[in-house]
Amino acid sequence: MEKTFLMVKPDGVQRELIGEIVKRFETKGYKLAGAKLMQVSNQLAETHYSEHKERPFFGELVDFITSGPVFAMVWEGENVIATARKMMGKTNPLEADPSTIRGDFGISVGKNIIHGSDSAESAEREITLFFTENEIVSYEKQANNWIY
């Protein structure tokens, strides 16, 4: 079963949107395999966003993601990466469709509530950055018989 990494960013945590976001993925039928509230260190932020290191907004990105707690999650299910991207909406909340997370709650590109893996490779990399093997729980979701 495919896995993806999602993270409610500091703005989403401060605005108390964790429950709403988790509910959307549970309602969709996906399985939560790992979750934790954590403070991202500068080192972890720089590693996580290393692909943007040469971009002018890199420093602001690191400052923002380390400015408060985040809620890191691992979700599992069929096509979870692509579906999560659709559920999140476009990066710029002003361009995101209504009923997406960013369309409903996002205000600006810099504070857009949620991060999600964009590929299977990114998901694997991000999951191992934020979670140890022992923090990912493997279990059979009984509702899967009704979903898949």
Curated annotation (Swiss-Prot):
- State where the protein is found: Cytoplasm
Q: Which residues carry this modification: Phosphothreonine?
A: T91
One GO cellular-component annotation of the UniProt record comes to: cytoplasm
Needed cofactors: Mg(2+)
Q: Which CDD domains match?
A: NDPk_I
Q: What is its EC number?
A: 2.7.4.6
Active site residues of this protein: H115 (pros-phosphohistidine intermediate)
Task: Give me the reactions it catalyses.
Answer: a 2'-deoxyribonucleoside 5'-diphosphate + ATP = a 2'-deoxyribonucleoside 5'-triphosphate + ADP; a ribonucleoside 5'-diphosphate + ATP = a ribonucleoside 5'-triphosphate + ADP
Domain of life of the organism in this record? Bacteria
SUPFAM superfamilies from the entry? Nucleoside diphosphate kinase, NDK
On subunit structure and binding partners, the annotation says:
Homotetramer.
- Identify its protein family: Belongs to the NDK family.
| Name of the protein this chain belongs to | Nucleoside diphosphate kinase
Task: Give the species this sequence originates from.
Answer: Oceanobacillus iheyensis (strain DSM 14371 / CIP 107618 / JCM 11309 / KCTC 3954 / HTE831)
